[in-house]
């Protein structure tokens, strides 16, 4: 299957305001790219932040391509890191859930994670709507609101600007059979 068809499908879903299918498709892109970029971690031959395997490779890919740069301008806090994005992927694709509150919370701080969409959740507004991190007045609680289209747009931007311009990546990923045929 041509990997660019996944990008087209995500954009089509967003255009039709079908954000959950767009999110599901977007969350598989880091899997594909991480397997290509970090095969040693993916196949458990080396580690990233003490972990190995598919999740560790996914987390490293997300951190290096998005997470390390996706900082809330007001609080200076990262919106989503690689481990949390991997957890979001697993919860959403395997359980139909986005409950990351317990996973993201630490001993002295409760974090509430929400996926959002708005009238500005559209790829025509650059990369999508607004995401934010807010603290409670006592700084013990934190709300993270992640715009679905914003996340999808960032993942798509990395795919389109890096990987879809890499002939070796295209050959390796398109060499796999998906047995998908579109009849018109």
Predicted regions and their residues:
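Generic alpha-helical secondary structure signal
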Residues: 1-4, 8, 52, 56, ...
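Short runs of predominantly hydrophobic/aromatic residues within well-ordered alpha helices
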Residues: 19-26, 30, 82-85
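Flexible secondary-structure boundary motifs
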Residues: 28-79
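Long, charged low-complexity segments
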Residues: 60-169
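Sequence termini and other peripheral, non-core segments
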Residues: 165-184
């Amino acid at each position: 299957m041509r990997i660019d068809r996944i990008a087209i499908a995500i954009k089509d879903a967003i255009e039709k305001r079908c954000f959950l299918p767009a999110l599901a498709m977007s969350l598989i892109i880091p899997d594909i790219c991480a397997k290509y970029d970090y095969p040693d971690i993916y196949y458990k031959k080396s580690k990233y932040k003490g972990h190995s395997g598919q999740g560790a490779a996914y987390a490293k890919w997300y951190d290096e391509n998005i997470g390390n740069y996706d900082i809330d301008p007001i609080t200076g806090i990262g919106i989503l890191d690689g481990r949390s994005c991997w957890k979001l992927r697993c919860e959403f694709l395997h359980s139909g859930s986005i409950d990351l509150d317990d996973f993201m919370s630490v001993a002295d701080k409760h974090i509430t994670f929400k996926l959002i969409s708005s009238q500005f959740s559209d790829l025509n507004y650059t990369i999508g709507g607004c995401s934010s991190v807010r603290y409670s007045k006592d700084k013990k609680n934190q709300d993270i609101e992640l715009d679905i289209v914003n996340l999808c747009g960032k993942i798509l931007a990395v795919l389109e600007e890096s990987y879809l311009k890499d002939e070796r990546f295209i050959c390796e990923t398109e060499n796999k059979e998906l047995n998908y045929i579109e009849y018109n």
